[in-house]
A protein has these predicted regions:
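Phosphate-binding site recognition
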Residues: 1-296
């Protein structure tokens, strides 16, 4: 049973892999399989706009969600060669949502936290009515009962996690509600039992929260400190060279037009910018269209 929040299907990722250019980043799943159900299972990966954040979120969702069968979808990619391939494949209750989209659908920021909470809760009740007491009013309360009754843990993927922190900075009521929601979901003894993996992605790192201790159990991977996430954050130099060969573009020209970020030992390129050059061949000023581009 596929839901909007709970156990979504794999169509979005399927569509991405059907694109003219898809660069295999499924190696990230080998890392998440390694940290799943360990103390390193809380991940916040922040990167600038247009850096393929949603693609990563869709990939994680397609791989872990019990709502679909993704074996054939992943079989042609790197993760299928890993010993852990079958271990996580479609084995978890996945909750996946994009805060930006929820905010539009909820109509305004004031209702967004209850919109998200109730949206998840209603789908959990639909699927697991028999194990959730009628008095439960929070998504995370329901998750706790479900794990207790079924043993099945959750993978929670939040795209644009920081919208309410970024765009609603003046709205302290909404911020407080949202941070309490995240704490209920991720912080403390009980969440550590029902969460198998949490993956938050957005532009800001958690350390930018004024009340950052609220979520100090998250490992942060940022553009300035990417560590083992580096090769999954953008396109690497090797990947861009390979695309240049395929599309008959001059690598040095691409490189001088686009001075990649240096991350660890990887020169990392913005995927959308590179794809745009490969397909159009136009070296226009890409950044002017992407909004502000500060490194945080």
């Amino acid at each position: 049973h596929m839901g909007r929040f709970l156990n979504p299907g794999n169509e979005s990722f399927g569509e991405i892999t059907n694109s003219e250019i898809y660069v295999d980043k499924t190696g990230l799943l080998e890392y998440t399989n390694k940290v799943i159900s360990t103390t390193s299972k809380f991940i916040c990966n922040s990167r600038p706009r247009r850096f393929g954040k949603s693609i990563t979120a869709d990939m994680l969702s397609a791989y872990y969600s019990k709502g679909c069968d993704s074996k054939a979808l992943f079989e042609k990619y790197d993760i299928s060669k890993c010993a852990s391939f079958e271990k996580g494949l479609n084995k978890y209750n996945v909750i996946h949502f994009d805060v930006q989209w929820c905010m539009m659908d909820a109509g305004n920021a004031d209702n967004v936290v209850s919109y998200i909470n109730n949206g998840i809760l209603n789908e959990l009740i639909e699927e697991y009515a028999s194990v959730i007491p009628a008095t439960v009013t929070t998504a995370y309360g329901a998750m706790s009962y479900i794990r207790e009754a079924t043993g099945c843990q959750f993978v929670v993927i939040i795209d644009e996690w920081d919208v309410l922190v970024r765009d609603e900075a003046q709205n302290s009521k909404v911020q407080e509600e949202y941070i309490n929601f995240l704490r209920g979901m991720f912080k403390g003894t009980e969440p550590s039992k029902f969460i198998a993996l949490a993956y938050l992605t957005g532009i800001l790192p958690i350390k930018r929260l004024k009340t950052q201790s609220a979520l100090n159990n998250f490992e942060e991977f940022t553009m300035l400190d990417a560590r083992h996430m580096a090769s999954y954050i953008g396109f690497t130099e090797d990947e861009v060279r390979m695309l240049c060969n395929k599309y008959d573009r001059n690598y040095d020209q691409v490189k001088s037009w686009y001075d990649g970020y240096l991350l660890e030992n990887y020169q990392v390129y913005n995927p959308k910018a590179v794809v745009s050059i490969m397909l159009s061949g136009k070296y226009q000023s890409y950044w002017s269209q992407t909004g502000s581009y500060e490194v945080i």
